[in-house]
Curated annotation (Swiss-Prot):
Organism: Aspergillus niger (strain ATCC MYA-4892 / CBS 513.88 / FGSC A1513)
Pfam families linked: CSN8_PSD8_EIF3K
Taxonomic lineage of the native organism: Eukaryota, Fungi, Dikarya, Ascomycota, Pezizomycotina
Leader sequence segment: none
Any one Gene Ontology cellular component term annotated for this protein: eukaryotic 48S preinitiation complex
Function: Component of the eukaryotic translation initiation factor 3 (eIF-3) complex, which is involved in protein synthesis of a specialized repertoire of mRNAs and, together with other initiation factors, stimulates binding of mRNA and methionyl-tRNAi to the 40S ribosome. The eIF-3 complex specifically targets and initiates translation of a subset of mRNAs involved in cell proliferation.
Segments forming domain PCI: 46-233
Record's protein name: Eukaryotic translation initiation factor 3 subunit K
Gene Ontology molecular-function annotations: ribosome binding; RNA binding; translation initiation factor activity
Amino acid sequence: MGVTFDKCETRPANIDAILNGLDRYNPETTTVFQDYVAQQCEDRTFDCYANLALLKLYQFNPHLLQAETVTNVLVKALTVFPSPAFSLCLALLPAHTQPFQASDAEAQAAAQTSDFVESIQKLARLSTLLESAQYTQFWSTLNSDDLYADLVADVAGFEELVRIRIAVEVGKTFREIPAEVLEQWLDLRSREALEKFVAEVCSWEVDKSGANTVIKVPTNKENEARSEVKSERVGVDMFGRVIRRGSSRLHERIDKRYPHRTQPFSF
């Protein structure tokens, strides 16, 4: 059974107390949540519910917003794809930061001159690539600009966490995958690094028996092909209701078309 959205096994007791009380709306707790985000970046955990509470406080108190903390929250959300975490966080940010064109002229001007807005929109691009399984394009985009490196620098093990999430999705979909393809999807620059990752992290098999190296994924409930036959019993009485309903409608149409007939039609 999955963990409910508002729960986090690694959440400290003081954070849990704030989230379950009125203090979650107290601006003075902003610094507590900010420190908690920094902790998540260091210990590779993710507490979506607490991070959303912080972004909500920023929404009510814009003067308290810390751009670096916001981008760290979004980067952490990337490490738990596929999930609604990134979209939920993005929805709580100011309108001019959103990855679509603003209608207000002042908002457009702010968007064009803000490094913060550029950072948000770059992270939104990464999220789109991950959620649409464009993994090779994700890595090439991530490596294309030094700003991306700066954005993910505070999140310990970012690349490793993303690789693990990609591997999880591959394991749900494939029984076999060419090593060359998986290399690109995981952005592992050598065959040795790939073989080490799939063996130690994924416990998958590397098959070199053929002309091309293939990674074999063990059967699981997601990637196993299953034939499923469903049968339904349809009683005669069910057909009777359908026939009576159709007959009734047919009579209504005939009455409308031939209102002056004296003899009934027989069927």
